[in-house]
UniProtKB/Swiss-Prot annotation:
The lineage of its organism: Eukaryota, Viridiplantae, Streptophyta, Embryophyta, Tracheophyta. A motif (Nuclear localization sequence (NLS)) lies at residues 40-43. Changing T61D: Phosphorylation mimic mutant unable to respond to far red light (FR) and to fulfill associated FR responses thus leading to very long hypocotyl, altered anthocyanin accumulation and closed cotyledons, abnormal constitutive subcellular localization in cytoplasm and impaired chromatin binding at direct target genes. It comes from Arabidopsis thaliana (Mouse-ear cress). The modification Phosphothreonine is found at T61. Belongs to the FHY1 protein family. This is Protein FAR-RED ELONGATED HYPOCOTYL 1.
Length: 202
């Protein structure tokens, strides 16, 4: 296989104006080389190895045709005299090692701490706390709260419930009493929307 050649001219890799770039054609599995112009401000992948751990994971995984080695060191610099196949192997192993490092970081004891902190909150929401935490008076209030509310509503009577309902627009109340239905004409839905949107336009 042809080797990647880069003219160093005693310059740092980030100061090189051009380098050879590989393209892998997935349909033919052929390696091609192109010369790519790079500004002096850009960095090579080897210069970015420290920054790669801070970036989010890439959306693509290792190439299917290239074996991903867990024993290779992805942070080592790539020698410019390697062949193109070794370049592909090293770049894919860097991606795989970053994936493995991120998975190891995410599976720590922090997850357990978060589960414990949310457990008491979820118990409070769904009412699955231990009954030992409550006094007897609090338990009676919780159990009989619904019954007390129903008794109070029955004592007030249905007529005092005010048979007025507010429409979804929130502006007009509709009486459900039979005597008031004959006095006022209820607007249609179209009229209600016209009135509502006309007030919004003002």
């Amino acid at each position: 296989m042809p080797e990647v050649e880069v003219d160093n001219n005693n310059e740092k890799p980030s100061e090189i104006n051009s380098f050879h770039h590989m393209i892998i054609s997935s349909s033919k599995n052929v390696l091609k080389m192109e010369e790519v112009e790079v500004s002096k401000k850009r960095k090579f992948q080897t210069d970015q190895s420290d920054e790669l751990s801070l970036l989010p994971l890439s959306k693509h995984t290792c190439f299917a045709n290239v074996a991903c080695s867990e024993n290779t060191n992805g942070n080592s610099e790539i020698d410019t005299e390697y062949s193109m196949s070794s370049y592909v192997n090293s770049t894919t192993s860097m991606e795989c090692n970053n994936d493995i490092e991120m998975k190891e970081e995410s599976s720590g004891s922090c997850g357990e701490d978060k589960m414990i902190s949310f457990e008491s909150h979820l118990d409070y929401i769904y009412g699955t706390q231990n009954l030992e935490d409550f006094s007897e008076k609090v338990i009676e209030n919780i159990l009989y709260l619904d019954e007390q509310e129903e008794e109070e509503e029955d004592a007030k009577g249905c007529s005092s419930n005010a048979a007025k309902f507010v429409l979804s627009s929130g502006r007009w109340t509709v009486n459900q009493d039979d005597s008031t239905l004959h006095e006022t004409k209820k607007p249609t839905i179209d009229q209600e929307f016209e009135q509502y949107f006309s007030t919004l336009m003002l």
